[in-house]
Amino acid sequence: MAASENPRDRAVQHMFNRIARRYDLLNRVISFRLDNRWREQAIQSIWTADNPLILDLGAGTGDLTFSALKTAGGGRIVGLDFSLEMLRLAQRRSRSVPHGEQSRFVLGSGLRSPFRDAVFDGVMSAFVLRNVSDLALFFDQAFRVLRPGGKFVSLDMFPPSKGLFAGFYGLYFYHVVPWIGALLAHDRAAYQYLSESVRTFHSPVMVAEILKQAGFAHITWRRFLCGAVCMHVAERPNPSGIPA
């Protein structure tokens, strides 16, 4: 399946294919090993049914998927990603992690989700939004595949609030991280892109507004690490009032 007709999307797809094998290690280094804790909190916010069917948008190597299965035990998760190399690693990991058999992975784009309407109890995404060329369309698709009453949760990185930490973060993320990428992944350009994607991304308030425009309700967000990471939670309204 072609990644996208958008040149930016194709470039991002090729970049993630290049860095797939080192991506998880670099996430740990870049986040000071806090990313797993943030994922657990995202999972807790969305796991509202006993045996839910969850979509992991931009699943990558399966970090969020496997964290959810380990944390919650029950449920089934479908991971969607447009990087073939990432999904190959996810599929391989699924054979050796707890409850890995409750996951499956699909090659495709979150901008053209291949799933039917209102099929998932929840949709989750971690560190994906900044890499999406059309965030409004991405949220529209997430809304479409959610059942009424289902929740959407996303984690992503943002420029932190002003202050001493913001200065340290700017030095670390915009200057040190590309060097770490060059050292560990042998791809400085990829991590230069990731740094720039944070610098130029929407504010958390704007992300919440785009979620609202897509039809979501009960939108909240929570800041971690002085605002360097935010978790947005939103719900597809359920006009009938019947639980999803």
Regions found by a protein language model. Name each.
Residues Y23, V123-M124:
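Hydrophobic beta-strand segment of the Class I
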Residues L111-G122:
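A short acidic, Gly/Pro-enriched loop at the edge of an enzyme's catalytic core
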Residues A136-P148:
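A short glycine-rich, Lys/Arg-flanked "PGG" loop and its adjoining helix->strand segment in the class I
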